[in-house]
Regions:
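N-terminal Rossmann-like NAD(P)+-binding domain of SDR-like oxidoreductases, especially those catalyzing
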Residues: 1-80
Length: 80
């Protein structure tokens, strides 16, 4: 199974990526890197796309062949 995670370089997305890698999934995902960091993911095991979720054309292209999508992208702000 192949899972695509939006917001993959953030706290939630990167932990989901680790979980699914351990379960044997193929993992790919995107992040605009506004709040996330590439240091949070293992790029040797994860296909990473620097895409804003509002870029539907690029997002659609990156999701080709994906079985599951997990949407973890969000704008995070202190005090919410």
């Amino acid at each position: 199974m192949h899972i695509f995670i939006t917001g993959i370089a953030g706290f939630l997305g990167s932990n989901l990526a680790d979980y699914y890698l351990k379960k044997g999934f193929k993992v790919s995902g995107c992040d605009n890197l506004v709040g996330g960091s590439l240091d949070n993911i293992d790029q040797s095991k994860i296909k990473f796309y620097k895409i804003n979720c509002e870029d539907l054309k690029s997002l659609s292209e990156a999701m080709k062949g994906v079985d599951i999508v997990c949407h973890a992208a969000a704008y995070a702000h202190e005090g919410l």
